[in-house]
């Protein structure tokens, strides 16, 4: 085989390899684009779901329900509330572990922004022993109050997620928010908004 034929074969091999590589790269980019678009659609659905929940429960008024502190002292929800609004965080041992980790982690990060005496943490679980063990696992440097009975029954039961809301002595739900771990910037925006609205 002459030198020219060797060169021609080599060039054809290089072109074939380069063409295959470029096709694979284009296919990879197309797959990534489709994946990102899919993520974007999921995020939109999550945000719309959050907005619809906020609208559905806006101004919902809780009956005054009993709570218990870590020392076993019983009190009513209204005893923790004041005329000025407080941030209420409700969490359950039945919530998904990654949701708990994300939400509690974010709550810890805003303790230097929102006064601790303006935060009420309500913990729900099955039985006093489980409640105490679950509360201890959160490592929150805040007073925790256990639910006695089923105060939140029928309120975001199906969602089974931690949530926040603002409330006062009127016991009305305002600015309800369900953190979405897939969209952390949404949670950041919520806390920035309520900090500016209520605590600055």
Task: List each model region and its residues.
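Short acidic, S/G/P-rich loop/turn micro-motifs used as interaction or catalytic elements
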Residues: 93-99, 126-128, 180-182
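Structural microenvironment flanking redox-active thiols in thiol-disulfide oxidoreductases
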Residues: 100-137
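Short active-site neighborhood of thiol/selenol oxidoreductases, capturing the structured segment around
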Residues: 72-110
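Thiol-/selenol-based redox modules, centered on thioredoxin-like
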Residues: 166-200
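Short, internal strand/loop/helix patches
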Residues: 134-167
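Hydrophobic membrane-insertion alpha-helices, especially the h-region
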Residues: 5-25
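N-terminal "domain-start" segment that seeds a small globular fold
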Residues: 32-79
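Structural beta-sheet core signal
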Residues: 89, 120-122, 166
């Amino acid at each position: 085989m002459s030198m020219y034929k060797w060169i021609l074969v080599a060039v054809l091999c290089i072109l074939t390899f380069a063409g295959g590589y470029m096709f694979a790269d284009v296919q990879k980019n197309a797959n990534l684009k489709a994946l990102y678009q899919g993520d974007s659609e999921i995020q939109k659905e999550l945000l719309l779901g959050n907005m619809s929940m906020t609208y559905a429960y806006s101004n919902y008024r809780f009956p005054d329900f009993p709570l218990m502190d870590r020392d076993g002292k019983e009190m009513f929800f209204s005893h923790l509330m004041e005329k000025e609004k407080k941030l209420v965080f409700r969490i359950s041992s039945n919530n998904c572990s990654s949701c708990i980790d994300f939400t509690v982690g974010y709550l810890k990060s805003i303790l230097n922004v929102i006064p601790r005496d303006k935060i009420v943490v309500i913990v729900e679980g099955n039985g006093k022993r489980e409640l105490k063990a679950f509360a201890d696992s959160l490592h929150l440097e805040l007073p925790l109050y256990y639910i006695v009975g089923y105060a939140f029954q029928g309120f975001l039961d199906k969602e089974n997620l931690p949530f926040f809301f603002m409330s006062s002595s009127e016991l009305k739900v305002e600015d309800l928010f369900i953190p979405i771990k897939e969209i952390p910037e949404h949670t950041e925006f919520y806390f920035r908004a309520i900090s500016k609205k209520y605590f600055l």
